[in-house]
Each structure stands twice: as C-alpha cells, then as structure tokens.
C-alpha cells in the first residue's frame, strides 16, 4: 500500500515538472513569423529612410537565390541612395543562404565604396542571424539597436 502512495506522489511530481518545463520552454519562439518580425522592424526601428517591401522575384534576383533556395522570403529595401534594408528568409539550407547574403554584401560594399562612401559604415557590421530554419539580415545605421529589437522579438 505504501508503494502505491509513493508511486502516485512520484508520478504527480514528474507530471508537475513536465508541465512546468513545457510551459516555460526556453523563453524563445518556436519559429519566426516573417510578417510579425517585418511589422516590428518597420514600426519600432528607424532606418535612414522608409523601406519598401519588394516581391519574391525581386528578392531572388537581389540576393542571387532561386525558388529552391528558400521556402519564404520577405525583404524591405531603401532607395539606391542608402544601404538600409532587411530580409527574412525561411529555408531548408541556412548555410547556403548565408553564403549568398555574404556574397551580396561584398558586391554591395564595392559598389557603395565608389558610389556612396558615407554608407560604408553600415556595411562593415551588418546583422546576419540564423534562428532555426530562418536567416535574417539587417543593414542599418544602428545595427546594435536593430539586433536588440530582433532578439526581443525572439523572446516573446
């Protein structure tokens, strides 16, 4: 009889612990919702100018991607007068996407070195973050605050 009581208490303790762990998790999102993050970036962060969303075909060309490289893409860019932009890419191959983004940044750096040298500082430390199956790139005049906002989004 005592063993039944002990077993019930152990089961209850384990069940309670499991519920606590499942409810608290690690305090991070299970995945990035592109539209939500884009809204947060546009509403709560000040870029050098208002960014415009581009369609997936334009984003593919811009970042040298093909449809097989990503599952979803959401990109906002400025005019050619500024480097500011951000892109959210859901993919099965984050490594390949990051490689393409780095190539894109190298070319952009070369172009802006001659064209708009005052924009170069933004390109020296761009944000490229990988979270699960998503890659996020942000180029702005205040990458520290942009990164902080992105990380706050992940915690919610």
Predicted regions and their residues:
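C-terminal motif of bacterial Sec signal peptides marking the signal peptidase cleavage site
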Residues: 22-25
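Bacterial signal peptide processing site
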Residues: 27-29
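A short, solvent-exposed beta-edge/loop patch
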Residues: 119-156
